[in-house]
């Protein structure tokens, strides 16, 4: 028999952000759930568009996450930063991959000590002086953020191509960043974004002055992407993801005019104007945080492909829920372990499984439910009184065998993810 699962219920000021950590339960059903319960219409409530949190409360929650260091307020950044702080950020960004030779594979071969040292050394950490000039820049395309300055994948198995240990996250085009350092060969820039630090391709950046940069970092007028993806044609096609913020305004004829980033030959930012029809993929400002908006946004990405760290033009479990809440004005941390720290913990030890499920009944739809290394969005109970979630899942275990799904699905909580 399996050991009793231990739960914790995460309680906070906002009911919409109640969340629970759930460890493995015995598998009783294969993923995913299909049928009516796997549609947005099943969970929408007629007329239920009352905000669960006001825009002010959403902004306050974002500010609290900044105060706790879970996300970054890059708009208040200084012009110079202590070199020691930048060195510490670079080491932290490596997430342990620079401490000892990891047992990983590159191009199907075991990673060698020489290759590992070469990549770590290319960070040129010893060249960082007492103070570093903080340079504002904007990404000009969807851009990988890497733990070390290399675009070669490091994988835990020789034939793996999906779970790159160096892939941190991705940024949308037009994402304001702070450039703090460069790799020895100049190919990579070490940047701080609103939710991450890491190495990006220097050619994906366009440098600009602070005032122009602020128009991307904190635009007064902007649109939010409400579909899984938005592609904008141009010299280089721009791919934006759910929740992305694009500076722009609406013209008198109802058309949407966007400010799009372009890098000139000298590496500087040129703002290109793009015109799009108002076809429902963009909304002015942020959406209100309501039950129905939560449901619509969550289901906008149903069955889209899972992408570890944003690879394959996809999302992973934590960026999926981050993007949903971002579209409604709440900035959450990027990674699941940091998202868990958004709220305080109330242990539920000593309760039976039935009592814990009863406690789950008090959790509102839209709550984030956590398991080790995984986060899900709670939908509620179906007609058969079974709690269901929607999540971007890579795999689960059935009879000890790992089953890969790699997409956004609706499911029960009766699965093992480790």
For the regions a language model picked out, list residue spans one by one.
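Second-shell loop/turn segments in exported
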Residues: 161-164, 280-285, 303-312, 356, ...
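Active-site nucleophilic cysteine motif
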Residues: 308-338
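Bacterial N-terminal signal peptides
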Residues: 12-24
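...with weaker cross-activation on analogous glycine-rich loops/strands in unrelated enzymes
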Residues: 170, 333-400
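Conserved beta-strand/loop element in small beta-rich adapter and peptidoglycan-binding domains
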Residues: 63, 160-183, 235-252
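Bacterial N-terminal signal peptides that target proteins for export
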Residues: 3-14
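Boundary regions of SH3-family modules and the immediately adjacent low-complexity/disordered segments
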Residues: 30-146, 152, 162, 178, ...
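Low-complexity, Gly/Ser/Thr/Pro-rich intrinsically disordered linker/tail segments
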Residues: 32-47, 392, 396, 400-418
